[in-house]
């Protein structure tokens, strides 16, 4: 079992490197039991990657940062993302990611759910390990 203060892994630090992007950084975070490479983030949130070793992955969308995440990471809009998951649900029997309403809720879900990964716009007060900076 893990404790609530377990370290979160930052699977990717995604910024465009310009002044505007710095005002809206995006961090992909995972539960301490998840080993995920930045290149696997897209596959995770599109249902193509379901396990990291023996750990069942649980993607968690952050409603507050979803538009930014979809544009920067998945390079699609909300309509296309929803359509993708509707098709995947019928075709493959997969459920779309859970949805958190804010950074704080996403962090809490990742801390308490083994296999969970999400994304946030701030890391204030969070003990993390940066795996990659892009």
Identify the function of each model-found stretch:
Residues 17-23:
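Sec/Tat signal peptide C-region and signal peptidase I cleavage site
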Residues 1-10:
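Bacterial N-terminal signal peptides that target proteins for export
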Residues 23-134:
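Flexible loop/hinge segments at secondary-structure junctions
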